[in-house]
Amino acid sequence: MFRRRTRRGGADIHVADPTYDDWAILRDFEDLETGLAFRDQLRDAGIKAVLTSDWELDRFRRGDIALRVEAADYGDAEVLLSGLDDA
């Protein structure tokens, strides 16, 4: 199990980590920077979110990246990212 670390000590992406296999996939991304932006939006809203990949990213920080949330938070996360939240 591998993790790429942020400057703040948290994991940017969880690689080959089965811990999050039961979490719902909300979006897929090809580059880490875009994935981090979406993940951080969810975290700022109080939703637990992580980025996962089955394989290491390439040298350009690209790969098959999944944005995951806990199943109970899927609906709220989808509404937030879709811009449909009226509140």
Regions from the PLM with identified roles:
Residues 1-87:
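Acidic/polar low-complexity segments and flexible, solvent-exposed patches
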